[in-house]
């Protein structure tokens, strides 16, 4: 429904025509070209699988894991052979929750303790991330073409690519966070569809709080996925908080758009309780469930700490197993809290979060420049570096600025949602600047950067009231940019995969002094 034009004079009419009812948003609840959308998604996903799985088992460090794979690949192997738990290191400590290592163990179960085995699950998750980004971009832009563009961009992102091909935990965190975001985008559309039908049925004004929205299974799924994110790395908690606030704001805005008398109080009355359940109880339950092998173990780290370092009595009737898990969690937290520069913890490839948006300080995962054949008398260089594709990451600041402007000035919810996801992976790290940090913490920011760029390209393609010449120019601009990103990715491919290159080429690949 739309308001009739009240500014145009009409002969024989002494008063302006007014709308017979309140104006509500048009019934747009998602893309309609399902067949084309899934066909496009299948093609993009197949391309992602080729890039993520090609020569996946290489490189290794003389048959052993590289960089921090040295922590997680062995721990996953222990999980596989110790009934789901890592070896108890005695004086050491296992400092991350179990889900990521449980997933790595699946690949090791299938292919053995080798490069393919410990990287297989991460590559599968990398392909799923590409599919999710493609579907999210298509849904929020209402354009299958924009979805395809986003898919190509995430395929060609160096950070997403390398993280998918190494046995670190971040790729699993990214998959769960992005999947939760995808669920919430579907939930947003479903809420508006329910509000629309409630408006047509006259149920909006039944109370001043507005109608109840019923069971929201997509939001429930988001809660489960966020619990898995927290059970991979604790930084998943940031997404629980940011996404929880985001969905409540979406609910309040929907109630306002459909003329609920008190939309914000209606959100607090109708939506806050269910949201607290989904973003509080469900993730916590999933997190505890991920420790089921730990609870069942007799030898897991700190499993029977009650009665040893902590007393047998408790003020609250909490089971000893949960008290032991709390002690274990606190010990791991203390480890992370003390991993600071002030305490003498330094690493040649550490970085601070203000360098992450533009990939100013990447991480060198592996390098071999001694007696590598293929470059004549001089040794070749084989290296794997986690670095963002410059054609995307170097423009991050203006992209984020534009997204903020669209959110605040134009009230464009799409950019606002993407900013929430990006900032959930970025802002919390400023709370403890002295902590030792690395660029791979920014892996979870990459999909949201890609989504923001894809939305901008979509706005260039579909700018309203364009004449044919401007439409053609916009199409050429978008094609040129996507080709530039793919070319940039192809140029950097050797240092993303460990292919041998000459010393001269290596120096050409290192664009900034801070990359050394």
Curated annotation (Swiss-Prot):
GO terms for molecular function: dolichyl-phosphate-mannose-protein mannosyltransferase activity. It is found in: Cell membrane. Pathway: Protein modification; protein glycosylation. It is a multi-pass membrane protein. The chain crosses the membrane at residues 113-133, 143-163, 166-186, 234-254, 275-295, 384-404, 413-433, 437-457, 473-493. GO terms for cellular component: endomembrane system; plasma membrane. Keywords: Cell membrane, Glycosyltransferase, Membrane, Transferase, Transmembrane, Transmembrane helix. Signal peptide: none annotated. Disruption phenotype: Not essential. There is no significant difference in growth between the wild type and the insertion mutant. Inactivation of the gene has little effect on metabolism or cell wall permeability to drugs. In contrast, tolerance to cell wall stress induced by the SDS detergent is slightly reduced in the mutant. Deletion of the gene leads to the loss of protein O-mannosylation. The mutant phenotype is unaffected by the lack of manno-proteins. PANTHER family: DOLICHYL-PHOSPHATE-MANNOSE--PROTEIN MANNOSYLTRANSFERASE (PTHR10050), PROTEIN O-MANNOSYL-TRANSFERASE 2 (PTHR10050:SF46). Protein O-mannosyltransferase that catalyzes the transfer of a single mannose residue from a polyprenol phospho-mannosyl lipidic donor to the hydroxyl group of selected serine and threonine residues in acceptor proteins. Belongs to the glycosyltransferase 39 family. This is Polyprenol-phosphate-mannose--protein mannosyltransferase. It comes from Mycolicibacterium smegmatis (strain ATCC 700084 / mc(2)155).
